[in-house]
Regions:
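Acidic/polar-rich alpha-helix caps and helix-coil junctions
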Residues: 1-93, 103-202
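Membrane-interfacial helix termini and the short, flexible loops that connect transmembrane helices
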Residues: 98-99
Length: 202
């Protein structure tokens, strides 16, 4: 299956690069907020990571423009399915462990969830912070995700200093105009990120 997925992504990128769709495609076919090329690169990075091709995963992650978000848009007519299942039906909600197990001061927890303390069968439940309305968009990828894929690939390729810099780049990311989770944490000392197990755990 992975081979087929990667082949489809390679084909999609080749066709998109060859044609470079014009205004008709961009205004009438492409969903608003979708960046086709960056999304293909991000999917290649994800699936190459799963396939264990660290060099290819790193190469694809490095091609993603981290200053660009790519999202799936929704509206009151085409409702965000996570919002629908979580807010209207109440079937899907995040467990409070996402928030409680986060490192102290990690701003990504509050980006993703809001405290609700709803009684669940196993754990108390929170609410999704990012899917509070019918029209909330769903990102195809986050820039920080691409940085972490790169960090993992660098670790597995033996580049500990490069991986450490990538991990700390994610930890210290704070501010900016993009709607993305930002940790706003301090960088970790080199001595805490000087082995592959430490980097992969982080």
């Amino acid at each position: 299956v992975l081979t087929s997925v990667l082949a489809l992504l390679d084909s999609a990128l080749a066709q998109y690069s060859a044609v470079r769709p014009g205004s008709e495609f961009n205004t009438s076919i492409r969903a608003a907020g979708l960046d086709v090329e960056n999304t293909i690169y991000a999917m290649q990075a994800r699936y190459q990571r799963i396939a264990g091709d660290h060099s290819a995963a790193l190469a694809a992650a490095n091609l993603v423009n981290l200053a660009v978000l790519s999202v799936m848009p929704f509206s009151d007519q085409a409702i965000n399915p996570i919002h629908d299942l979580s807010n209207r039906a109440g079937y899907v909600k995040p467990r409070d462990t996402l928030r409680l197990t986060a490192e102290a001061g990690d701003a990504r927890a509050a980006y993703h969830v809001t405290v609700a303390a709803i009684r669940g069968n196993v754990r108390p439940l929170d609410n999704f912070a990012q899917y509070a309305s019918n029209s909330s968009s769903i990102p195809f990828y986050y820039p920080g995700e691409m940085r972490l894929i790169g960090a993992e690939a660098l670790t597995n390729l033996g580049d500990i200093p490069g991986a450490r810099a990538a991990v700390n780049g994610v930890r210290t990311k704070c501010g900016g105009s993009l709607n993305e989770p930002k940790a706003c944490l301090a960088a970790l000392a080199d001595t805490l990120l000087d082995t592959a197990p430490e980097l992969l755990a982080e």
